[in-house]
Amino acid sequence: MYTQAIDLAPGANPVRPEAASARDAAFEAAIAQDRKVEAQDWMPEGYRKTLVRQISQHAHSEVVGMLPEGNWVTRAPSLKRKAILLAKIQDEGGHGLYLYAAAETLGVARDDLIDALLSGRAKYSSIFNYPAPSWADMGAIGWLVDGAAIMNQILSLIHI
């Protein structure tokens, strides 16, 4: 049930569906019927926590993804490519801001999410930890990351 078993302490048992409250059962039924759940709607705390973790990880990846690209702004092979790279960096920052705003609607403070990133408690896409010593490396990393994101989005649409 929404990956909360990952967060369990060793030896702990997850809550069994039969032990869940009527409110939990109603929420599970709504999910099973593919009903939309809005941020202000009641949801189990584990579900909300998982959403915040997923959204913040995505936001952090957008922001951290700007860093290797930013290193290449002054070394881009042409003015046209420099302008394209600056636009891509700006897009990544904007995506991160949108995602932080979405997480805030779930009741967390943006400052807390950023503090978790800066302290190393939060996760982000590890591909950005690898060096991009050439313009081609930087392009390949961007292509692979964006391509993987597009495939995830397409596959999620297929399974609707």
Residue map of PLM features:
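Helix-loop segments that flank and shape redox-cofactor active sites
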Residues: 44, 65-87, 149-158
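Alpha-helical transition-metal enzyme core signature, strongest for iron centers
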Residues: 55-69, 88-103, 120-124, 139-150
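Conserved alpha-helical segments that form or flank metal/cofactor-binding pockets of metalloenzymes
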Residues: 2-24, 88-116
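Acidic/His metal-coordination segments adjacent to aromatic residues that form catalytic metal sites
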Residues: 36-56, 117-143
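Short, highly charged low-complexity linear segments
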Residues: 8-26, 122-131, 149-157
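Conserved small/polar residues in nucleotide/adenosyl-binding loops
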Residues: 1, 158-160
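Alpha-helical scaffold segments that form or flank carboxylate-/histidine-based iron centers
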Residues: 47-58, 76-95, 134-138
